[in-house]
């Protein structure tokens, strides 16, 4: 720390002039001046600020200044100095120091620039460092520098000599300021006099304020007061007389005088405060880590003073200016010695030469030992009551979080209070960083014990032990305060065989301990892999460095562009082989291999992905807890046969989860349908949308469930009451099982499940009335099943296994867990005999506390004063507080610990003797309490499977309630879809269909339409849809698919009637987008998506194709569109809506009898060149796309549109003639097309055309 950079503090900024406290008396302050070295008393001109009045009057003559000074001296006997002059700095210690000196002025002129007559000066080392190195106030620093320069030049010119001569003269003049210290009105008693020096020392370790004050690092948090480098704390109410502040109004600097109540002591020298440049390496406000401070200071203490030594007032370079930068941070290399530009550079590690390690202090060695292994991670390092970030991490905290930076050559630092760790860590994680948390593993008492056990102290043992306890990443968050998303948060690990297009994939939601595993045999377009990504939307990805193809990496970045997942490239050796993976999982699962994994052990790439995932979890310190509670499930992104398939392209084109405008959920199907009350219900509902049912009976059962809720309002009210205000029980029980939760979480979980149990009992009378088996299983307990024999059904892949088994009876388990502990005075106490060591420790504490209480009563009797009480102040606890008036009866052996004007506080011999024992027992209690908590939580984990089944039932109940709300609480007309079994071709017949997402915004303005495919009234299963641009074709296509998805989820649909067969899959080819990342053009994307349709579509599929062939030339595009249309109509025979601007496709002879035609109607104003879109579907073919009319409406210049009309007419005429010549249209059709083209043209042109036709073979 450089004193020259100190901020000049104006005392007045901390006080309102109308509120001033009464003076108080603090004893023992005089000794503070006695230890100050004489050689450190020389003034530092750089620290003397210039008041605004001085700055504006620098041109005044010295005689004017002398006159002002003489005038001032007549009003007071003291030499005046500037009211804004530098306040003496307190010694830099980890604790706070208060200077309880009463300042008053004898002048009658009021002022706002001096402090109240009584104030407390609290100096916090870290806050002082931060404030004096604050680069966010350049204007203020510049102004101060200008003031100092002006003052120096003014003094130099008046003295007629150089600055050095001036300094020599100035230092010989002793300050004439009369400083008086408040002393007790009564003589000190003998114990008080004996302990005066002790009090002086204690002032460096204690804060005499009644309320503890912590350093405020968070200077950007508006909820927390932003402390300056000094904090003046008013402790008493203002006095009407003695507290008024006065000063002389002169341009000569004034010095405050201190008016005593008793005879005063005038020191002959002023206090000097020393600063350690490495103080920020010490603990901040840390009563537990004093030894770290000592070690750091011994290792690298270079002390500078606020007042420079002789001859160093100007020009001397301090340590900060000459200190060299760590060499290993100048040329950064990884642990293997590879520089940053090396292809094998590992950004996770840092190479530190042995020569640097030997120069580190124990604390620095401790820090760099952890940081060098996690160099790509922002490390929060616990020091006392704060978490601190150093070096590059400090830069990130300063630049991205705007935290105040303590800038130094090495070990620059920012810090945050420990209570706000989650807040700042969450921000960094949201910005894409990984965050490491380093905690203190012992208290100062524990450290002392450890040192005593080792029989001494060495450098390694001289600091608090710290360990890296966790690494937080976007995909592995466990703390409920940091998980802001109620949907699942996934970490994905993949292992790829590029040659065979095979993937092994592992997804894990660590918040609930679920692993999803699958092997994908994909095609060239990686359609299944893309579908998997869109279904799961992982927040973080682990992939094998050098073994993952660029195409796969490109797909992940493109598909997940809205999520922006954290990408972790891992070395191949960090991917465990299948055998090693199975052995480690078996070991963590108590020697029992999960049955699901036994079935997958021969799938090499799947097990490789699982090994890579668990290896990563181990590295971030959560692998053991997650795997121990894990449930492994096989996952199939295309669950053929069990549910309707919605591939990735379908999820994107239909805007199921994210819209195409800004990537948000606004206007999506999920946003419309998700009415779930609980977080775990929302997670299940997302899976319901991804996998609509493909079983008629299951769909009908859901329909019956929501209809029962509609028809039974009393039951509906009770069901709603069960789910209302439930916390995220699924994640809470997972944390309890992992033993990472608080006892309050366990109590909350037990209370909620007990309340649910009571409410379910109220529904027993309605059991026989519910037709839906699904709803009945969610509401009623399966009393026929012995709860001790409930199978671990949550490990099953088929939800049907648990859907109809009934809600488990949890009452016996709740009572067993509750009996294992009690809560006494906010402390967790295990049942007696469960933890003998804890019982003994608690008994010792209670016995000691009782003896302390008895001792207090004895003191009250001795002093005959009931106001005597214990006072706990920071680390100094059990201080016996005695009013000053009663201290005459003070027994021998009492040691003074602190005092005020009204009371003194002591430690009696009894307290001194027994306090250490009490502190040791309490420290042991804290350690044992953690073990007790783990034991209690482990008792709950025994019954975890039963609670998980209950969560599944509640999730399903919440999803059914959401379907009910969408079906019967929407403003849109809804109907129950009727499903008809059909083993042949699929069909759909819908009346008055609307798009529910658009209708929710447009209301009754939305135009309904009918769709009929493969019905009695409309036998063809393929419809060719034409119409003008912007006529509503794409909307019709999407709403048809949305209706099918809603229907097969068991929900009502937005139509007046709906009859359909089960659809096995929906294919969509919508829009025209290129894929730059994959190197694919618009046409290539079209063909790839169309290829999947032709390859996988069946007679029961619904296919949506929009403007196929527009990505290439007209003739090539038409040819492809015709070929696909022909193949779908003759070979696949699936339900299909084929939207196109190629009207001629409807007349192709090979398909015209196999298709139906429809178009979106409109009204055309030829004169105004405008189109009024009617958005109503009609049978037939639209004669024109009216693209030029739309162009006119869009504002294109008239000249361009006229030219386009001429060219369009000629091209259309040529196209018709060519088609006639090649025999693709008949003579009558040719004439019809020509007449349509010329019906509003000049008659001469029509005659000219007739002559042309005569020359052709019209008999063709």
UniProtKB/Swiss-Prot annotation:
Which ranges are annotated Acidic residues under compositional bias? 24-43, 275-295
Subcellular localization, as worded in the UniProt entry: Nucleus
GO-annotated biological processes: mismatch repair
Q: Which PROSITE patterns match?
A: DNA_MISMATCH_REPAIR_2
Listed GO CC annotations: MutSalpha complex; nucleus
Record's compositionally biased regions (Polar residues): 1-15, 101-123
An MF annotation (GO) of this entry: ATP binding
Q: What is its main location?
A: nucleus
Which Pfam families does this UniProt record tie to the protein?
MutS_I (PF01624), MutS_II (PF05188), MutS_III (PF05192), MutS_IV (PF05190), MutS_V (PF00488)
Q: Which family does this protein fall into?
A: Belongs to the DNA mismatch repair MutS family.
Quaternary arrangement and interactors, per the entry?
Heterodimer consisting of msh2-msh6 (MutS alpha). Forms a ternary complex with MutL alpha (mlh1-pms1). Interacts with exo1.
Q: What does this protein do?
A: Component of the post-replicative DNA mismatch repair system (MMR). Heterodimerizes with msh2 to form MutS alpha, which binds to DNA mismatches thereby initiating DNA repair. When bound, MutS alpha bends the DNA helix and recognizes single base mismatches and dinucleotide insertion-deletion loops (IDL) in the DNA. After mismatch binding, forms a ternary complex with the MutL alpha heterodimer, which is thought to be responsible for directing the downstream MMR events, including strand discrimination, excision, and resynthesis.
The family database entries (NCBIfam families) matched by this protein are listed as:
PRK05399.1
Protein name in UniProt: DNA mismatch repair protein Msh6
Q: Which organism is it from?
A: Dictyostelium discoideum (Social amoeba)
Q: Name the gene that codes for it.
A: msh6
């Amino acid at each position: 720390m450089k004193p020259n950079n100190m901020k000049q503090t104006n005392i007045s900024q901390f006080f309102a002039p109308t509120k001033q406290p009464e003076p108080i008396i603090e004893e023992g302050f005089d000794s503070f001046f006695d230890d100050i070295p004489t050689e450190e008393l020389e003034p530092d001109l750089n620290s003397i600020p210039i008041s605004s009045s001085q700055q504006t009057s620098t041109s005044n003559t010295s005689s004017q200044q002398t006159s002002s000074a003489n005038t001032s001296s007549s009003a007071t006997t003291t030499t005046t100095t500037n009211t804004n002059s530098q306040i003496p700095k307190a010694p830099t210690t980890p604790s706070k120091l208060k200077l309880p000196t009463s300042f008053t002025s004898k002048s009658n002129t009021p002022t706002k620039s001096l402090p109240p007559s009584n104030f407390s000066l609290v100096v916090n080392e870290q806050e002082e460092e931060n404030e004096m190195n604050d680069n966010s106030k350049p204007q203020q620093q510049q102004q101060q520098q200008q003031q100092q320069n002006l003052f120096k030049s003014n003094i130099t010119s008046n003295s007629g000599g150089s600055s050095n001569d001036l300094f020599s003269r100035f230092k010989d003049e002793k300050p004439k300021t009369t400083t008086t210290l408040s002393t007790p009105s009564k003589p000190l008693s003998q114990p008080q006099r004996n302990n005066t020096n002790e009090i002086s020392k204690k002032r460096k370790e204690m804060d005499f304020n009644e309320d503890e004050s912590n350093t405020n690092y968070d200077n950007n948090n508006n909820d927390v007061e932003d402390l300056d480098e000094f904090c003046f704390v008013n402790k008493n109410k203002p006095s009407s007389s003695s507290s008024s502040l006065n000063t002389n109004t002169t341009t000569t600097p004034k010095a405050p005088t201190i008016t005593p109540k008793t005879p005063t002591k005038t020191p002959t020298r002023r206090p000097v405060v020393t600063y350690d440049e490495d103080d920020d390496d010490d603990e901040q406000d840390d009563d537990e880590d004093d030894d770290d401070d000592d070690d750091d200071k011994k290792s690298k203490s270079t002390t500078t003073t606020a007042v420079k030594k002789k001859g160093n007032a100007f020009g001397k370079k301090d340590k900060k200016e000459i200190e060299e930068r760590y060499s290993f941070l100048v040329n950064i290399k990884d642990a293997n010695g590879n520089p940053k530009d090396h292809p094998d550079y590992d950004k996770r590690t840092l190479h530190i030469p042995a020569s640097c390690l030997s120069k580190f202090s124990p604390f620095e060695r401790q820090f760099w030992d952890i940081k060098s292994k996690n160099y790509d991670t922002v490390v929060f390092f616990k020091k006392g009551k704060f978490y601190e970030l150093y070096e590059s991490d400090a830069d990130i905290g300063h630049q991205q979080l705007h935290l105040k930076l303590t800038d130094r050559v090495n070990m620059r630092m920012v810090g945050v209070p420990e209570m706000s760790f989650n807040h700042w860590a969450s921000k960094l994680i949201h910005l894409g960083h990984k965050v490491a948390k380093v905690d203190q593993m012992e208290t100062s008492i524990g450290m002392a014990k450890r040192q005593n056990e080792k029989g001494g102290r060495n450098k390694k043992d001289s600091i608090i032990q710290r360990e890296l306890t966790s690494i937080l990443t976007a995909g592995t968050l466990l703390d409920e305060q940091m998980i802001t998303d109620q949907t699942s948060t996934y970490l994905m690990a993949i292992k790829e065989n590029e040659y065979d297009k095979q993937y092994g994939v592992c997804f894990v939601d660590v918040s609930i301990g679920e692993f999803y595993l699958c092997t994908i045999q994909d095609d060239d377009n990686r359609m299944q892999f893309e579908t998997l990504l869109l279904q799961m939307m992982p927040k973080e990805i682990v992939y094998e460095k050098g073994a993952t193809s660029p195409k796969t990496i490109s797909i992940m970045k493109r598909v997940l562009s809205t999520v922006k997942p954290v990408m972790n490239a891992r070395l191949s050796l960090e991917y465990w082989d299948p055998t090693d993976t199975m052995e480690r999982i078996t070991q963590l699962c108590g020697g029992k291999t999960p049955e699901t994994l036994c079935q997958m052990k021969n799938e090499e790439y799947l097990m490789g992905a699982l090994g890579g995932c668990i290896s990563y979890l181990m590295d971030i310190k959560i692998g053991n807890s997650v795997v121990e509670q894990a449930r492994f499930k096989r996952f199939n992104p295309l669950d053929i046969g069990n549910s309707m398939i919605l591939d990735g392209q379908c999820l994107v084109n239909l805007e199921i989860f994210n819209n195409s405008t800004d990537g948000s959920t606004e206007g999506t199907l999920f946003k419309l349908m998700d009415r779930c009350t609980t977080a775990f219900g929302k997670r299940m509902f997302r899976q319901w949308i991804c996998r609509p049912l493909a079983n008629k009976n299951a769909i009908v059962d859901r329909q019956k469930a929501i209809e029962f809720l509609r028809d039974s309002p009393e039951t509906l009210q009770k069901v709603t009451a069960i789910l209302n205000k439930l916390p995220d029980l699924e994640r809470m029980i997972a944390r309890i099982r992992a033993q990472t939760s608080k006892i309050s979480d366990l109590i909350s979980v037990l209370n909620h499940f007990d309340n649910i149990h009571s409410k379910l009992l109220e529904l027993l009378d309605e059991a026989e009335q519910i037709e839906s088996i699904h709803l009945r299983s969610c509401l009623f307990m399966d009393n026929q099943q012995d709860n001790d024999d409930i199978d671990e059904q949550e490990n099953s892949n088929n939800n049907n296994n648990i859907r109809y088994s009934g809600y488990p009876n949890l009452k016996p388990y709740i009572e067993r867990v509750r009996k294992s502990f009690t809560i006494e005075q906010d402390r967790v106490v295990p049942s007696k005999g469960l933890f003998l060591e804890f019982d003994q420790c608690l008994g010792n504490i209670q016995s000691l506390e009782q003896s302390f209480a008895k001792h207090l009563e004895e003191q009250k009797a001795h002093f005959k004063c009931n106001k005597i009480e214990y006072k706990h102040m920071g680390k100094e606890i059990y201080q016996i507080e005695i009013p000053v008036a009663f201290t005459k009866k003070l027994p021998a052996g009492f040691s003074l610990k602190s005092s005020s004007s009204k009371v003194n506080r002591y430690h009696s011999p009894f307290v001194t003797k027994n306090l250490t024992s009490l502190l040791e027992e309490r420290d042991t209690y804290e350690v044992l309490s953690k073990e007790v908590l783990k034991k209690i939580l482990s008792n709950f984990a025994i019954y975890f499977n039963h609670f998980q089944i209950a969560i599944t039932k509640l999730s399903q109940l919440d999803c059914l309630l959401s379907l009910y709300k969408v079906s019967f609480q929407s403003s849109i007309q809804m109907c129950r879809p009727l499903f008809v079994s059909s083993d042949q071709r699929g069909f759909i017949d819908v009346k008055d269909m609307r798009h529910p997402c658009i209708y929710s915004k447009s209301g009754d303005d939305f135009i309904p339409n009918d769709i009929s495919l493969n019905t009695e009234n409309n036998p063809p299963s393929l419809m060719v849809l034409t119409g003008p641009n912007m006529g509503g074709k794409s909307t019709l296509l999407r709403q048809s698919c949305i209706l099918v998805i809603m229907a097969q989820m068991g929900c009502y649909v937005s139509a007046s009637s709906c009859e359909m067969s089960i659809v096995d899959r929906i294919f969509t080819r919508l829009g025209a987008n290129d894929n730059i990342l994959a190197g694919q053009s618009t046409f290539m994307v079209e063909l790839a998506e169309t290829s999947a349709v032709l390859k996988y579509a069946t007679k029961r599929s619904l296919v949506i194709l929009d403007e196929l062939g527009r990505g290439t030339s007209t003739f090539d595009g038409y040819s492809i569109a015709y070929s696909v249309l022909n193949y779908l109509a003759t070979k696949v025979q699936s339900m299909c809506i084929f939207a196109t601007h190629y009207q001629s496709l409807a007349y192709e002879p090979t398909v015209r009898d196999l298709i139906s035609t429809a178009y979106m109607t409109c009204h055309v104003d030829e004169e105004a060149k405008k189109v009024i879109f009617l958005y109503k579907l009609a049978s037939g073919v639209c004669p024109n796309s009216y693209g030029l009319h739309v162009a006119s409406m869009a504002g294109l210049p008239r000249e361009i549109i006229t030219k386009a009309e001429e060219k369009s007419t000629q091209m259309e005429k040529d196209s018709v003639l060519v088609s006639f010549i090649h025999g693709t249209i008949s003579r009558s059709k040719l004439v019809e097309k020509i007449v349509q083209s010329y019906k509003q043209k000049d008659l001469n042109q029509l005659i000219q055309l007739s002559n042309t036709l005569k020359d052709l073979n019209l008999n063709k």
